[in-house]
């Protein structure tokens, strides 16, 4: 049986995540009391005819604070039933969460006459800290629309051909912020920038003219060699430590040229020696 626990601050996309999982064959339970997590795992093993082999639950700040603070021991108890259990934590920056609540006019579950929306969001962060700290996978939804979030969840959680650590190599642009879910970040802004070549500006790192230009730059090749040498040595150590997910982020200024080129090459190289390597370009 596989159990996915979905959590995150209100407005970060938990409902969308549950919808995606339900569409892909998961039996979904919204706002499960955290204290019932071990019982759910036990009943799922005993009554296999009643529950599907894939279950997803959301646990959020509507829980009792005492249950949320006990999440580490509750999770350990559930995993003690020998169930594959993944914790997905969704989040976005505070300005984005405020904007989403303003646009939808929904009420935050922790607001009241004495607590503003901004204060409720900060209180929620504290309450969900024990879950965030134990998340196997974190997805920053700040810059994602609904369709991108659905694709990201399917890519990271559902498209794993074999068990083991799932590696994601992701390009991004610093001007739109660093991905908060990255485990390793490499800054390639020091490399020659095709953006300043008028004939290359409208192309991306996926296009042959940009590929040819960057491949001819000695600094680019040296940077690629250094990064790939590091990753080939240390990523297997991540896998050996039973990490479920590892995200490697490659950043340039806009996320269109240098980071895309390096990310594509790294993905192709790592796929030759590691299982479950995926490539994503955040800002294309």
UniProtKB/Swiss-Prot annotation:
InterPro entries: P-loop_NTPase, RapZ-like, RapZ-like_N, RapZ_C. The keyword ATP-binding applies. Keywords: ATP-binding, GTP-binding, Nucleotide-binding. GO terms for molecular function: ATP binding; GTP binding. The keyword GTP-binding applies. ATP binds at residues 8-15. GTP binds at residues 60-63. Displays ATPase and GTPase activities. NCBIfam families: PRK05416.1. PANTHER family: RNASE ADAPTER PROTEIN RAPZ. Belongs to the RapZ-like family. This is Nucleotide-binding protein PputW619_4266. It comes from Pseudomonas putida (strain W619). The lineage of its organism: Bacteria, Pseudomonadati, Pseudomonadota, Gammaproteobacteria, Pseudomonadales.
